Swiss-Prot record:
Active-site residues per Swiss-Prot or TrEMBL entry: H43 (proton acceptor), E70 (proton acceptor), H190 (proton donor)
Family: Belongs to the PNP synthase family.
UniProt organism field: Prochlorococcus marinus (strain AS9601)
Reaction catalysis annotation: 3-amino-2-oxopropyl phosphate + 1-deoxy-D-xylulose 5-phosphate = pyridoxine 5'-phosphate + phosphate + 2 H2O + H(+)
EC number, as in UniProt: 2.6.99.2
Protein name: Pyridoxine 5'-phosphate synthase
Pfam families, alphabetized: PdxJ (PF03740)
Gene symbol of the encoding locus: pdxJ
Length: 238
């Protein structure tokens, strides 16, 4: 049964729109946990457009579940991660002009550098995940580089409909099986919402789904704790 990681970046987006102190994403992480979140995910971007260093340090000290730190594999971020010591790090691609992460890491072109980055994090007892597109080549490189987890990018699945969405779902299912056979733990995320999450959650051996925007959007209408509870019930429905 898949677990739920709640991404709270969008809470920080609202705060940073006014460069003020509220809403505090640390407080909302507490509410997400009350709603049943199994982990809290934040993306500390190089430009600090939403989550700030202070948020990540406080989350590490206060949350009761696990902390998943998304970040680019830069020297600065590696040093920060080794100070914070999150439960795990998810390495993601990052472009300054993008609104949100647009695709998975290209592992093939960065094998040697990523081996060093992953090794450095593991030396600090941090488990490491790669955010990748559901492609067998990327999965094989994930294993070669030494990642513990992969997070499959579900953005294309979320954008499609009908038979095209079904084809993408099959690709995600096949990718999950390939990764499991290699000993990799599989997470998934990006674009998942209350309408499309069930089929991803029901994939055999899917470990965790990381979801943010749709939960926060629904929370504006019904409150964060309740919106997390509703998403958790969809993921864990037998």
């Amino acid at each position: 049964m898949a677990t739920l990681g709640v991404n709270i970046d969008h809470i920080a987006n609202v705060r940073q729109a006014r460069k003020t102190v509220e809403p505090d994403p640390v407080q909302f992480a507490f509410l997400a946990e009350l709603g049943g979140a199994d982990s809290i995910t934040v993306h500390l971007r190089e430009d600090r457009r939403h989550i700030q260093d202070r948020d990540v340090f406080l989350l590490k000290e206060t949350i009761k579940t696990k902390l998943n730190l998304e970040m680019a594999a830069t020297k600065e971020m590696l040093e920060i991660a080794k100070k914070i010591l999150p439960d795990y790090v998810t390495l993601v691609p990052e472009k300054r002009e993008e609104v949100t992460t647009e695709g998975g890491l290209d592992l093939k072109s960065n094998v040697q550098y990523l081996k060093k980055a992953v090794g450095s994090l593991k030396d600090s007892n941090i488990e490491v995940s790669a955010f990748i597109d559901p492609l067998s080549e990327q999965i094989n490189y994930s294993k070669e580089i030494g990642f513990d987890f992969i997070e499959l990018h579900t953005g294309k699945y979320a954008e499609l409909s009908g038979s095209n969405q079904h084809k993408e779902l099959q690709r995600i299912i096949e990718s999950t099986h390939i990764a499991n056979d290699l000993g990799l733990v599989v997470n998934a995320g990006h674009g998942l919402n209350y309408n499309n999450v069930r089929k991803i959650a029901s994939i055999n051996n899917m470990n965790e789904l990381n979801i943010g925007h749709s939960i926060v959007a629904r929370a504006l209408a019904i409150g964060l704790e309740k919106s997390v509870r509703e998403m958790k019930s969809l993921i864990t429905l037998n």
